[in-house]
Amino acid sequence: MQRENLDVLIIGAGLSGIGQGCHLVQKRPGTTFAILEARERLGGTWDLFRYPGIRSDSDMFTFGYRFRPWKSPKDIAPGPDILTYLNETVDEYGLRDRIRLQTRVTDLNWSSAENRWIATVHPDKGDTYEIAARFVVSCTGYYNYDHGYLPEFEGYDDFKGVIAHPQHWPEDLDYAGKRVIVIGSGATAVTIVPTMAETAAHVTMLQRSPSYVFSRPGVDKFADILRRVLPWRWAYKLSRVKNVLLSIYLYSVSQRKPDKIRAYLRKLAKDELGEDFDVDTHFNPTYGPWDQRLCLIPDGDLYKALKSDRADIVTDHVERFTTTGLRTKSGQEIDADIIVPATGLQIQFGGGMAVSVDNQPLDVANHLVYRGMMVSNVPNLAVTFGYTNASWTLKADLTADYVCRLLTQMDKRGVEVVTPKLDAMPDKTQALVGLQSGYLLRASHMLPKSGLESPWKNHENYISDMMSIRYGKFDDGVLAFGG
């Protein structure tokens, strides 16, 4: 089998993989690397999801790259605009020729004899080959791109209309004048409902339980003022700092004073929807704020749709699908031409690759994460896992920066291997992510764990991580250099 040698192998050409490539171009210009992408186009999430209204659920000042300002006045950005931003970034940093599309890594094995990762690569066209890489950065995201999560609905096949899955949206679906049911209460559902309601005959948002929803302007007035008086980069940096601090504050207060934030969010919803709307049934969850991710709606678009005659919300369980729609547990029959099961993601670690160390399969659930990016006792591997309580890209950027610093440190020491060493798994660990979202709870058995103390604790706090990752010392008693 033909073999290629690289310094760095990046797996995944989405937001994280592109960002890692840009960091290498800027900070390690002599490094040989390739970005392998299994799909036919780059962009990851922002190319895969094409449902109506697809947009960011974080502001683009923190969701955009630190090194490349987001210049659109809309800081809650439509998906196509984000995809354009990614493609422009690829061209600006000369990554187009380094990205190999329709090229899947199926197996990844660390060879201690060679001090290299050996990746088995399957291009859609051409022969299978191997890549021997000094360092691997997994930027595959956290969910299965081929299959979303779909509960077993009784009578699912009885429905005679169209079932449109958000993860695989039918390109030719015309929903104008149609009756639509959107099942779900998360970010996807609250995005789809107001968009489809613009032209559909009626949209019903059917949720098993409510989520916290936070309305904010689609255009940041503070950033808008800064852009008028400052150069783009300064306006971007200051807006970014403001939003980072604001998100950390909101999350911190939500954890310390959940009742205060709950009352605040309830008041905002009541102010938007009016006293006659049953906010407590539909927008007042039983869990605390930020125990699950807060759903962002720009300019109150979901509330506006619900106040119109084109959309309504039902909080109930699905009993079964029928030929003409579905029936809820309370007995309500809801007719529809189209049903959209916005029921969540299916977690997948490492893009489904079979990972092994010296031919011994790696079960990451029995390992801790080091600084939220490396895996205990696994050499020369970084896994980009962004924030779930803030913008994903903030952590992806820190990870990319750290990988570059770590490679430079290895060069200075004249070594080929670096491993975060752990003698034994501690008796007490934490979940990698603090959120209690269903898709994360379902996947707890397949994710690495967080320790209780640094550097094994996954802080999920940008300021703490920045100090640790960007400015922390390598000689911390954990990282072992050798080879």
Would you name each region that the model predicts?
Residues 2-5, 9-10, 15, 19-20, ...:
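Rossmann-like dinucleotide-binding core of oxidoreductases
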Residues 73-144, 320:
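Feature captures the FAD/FMN-dependent oxidoreductase FAD-binding
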Residues 70-88, 100, 183, 253-262, ...:
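Short beta-strand to alpha-helix junction loop
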Residues 397, 401-483:
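C-terminal active-site-capping segments
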Residues 6-11, 15-99, 207-208, 271-277:
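Beta1-alpha1 glycine-rich phosphate/pyrophosphate-binding loop at the start
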Residues 51, 338, 342-410:
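Glycine/threonine-rich phosphate-binding loop and adjacent beta-strand/alpha-helix elements that clamp
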Residues 11, 130-143, 180-183, 326, ...:
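Short hydrophobic core segments
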Residues 267, 272-328, 332-335:
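Alpha/beta-hydrolase fold catalytic core
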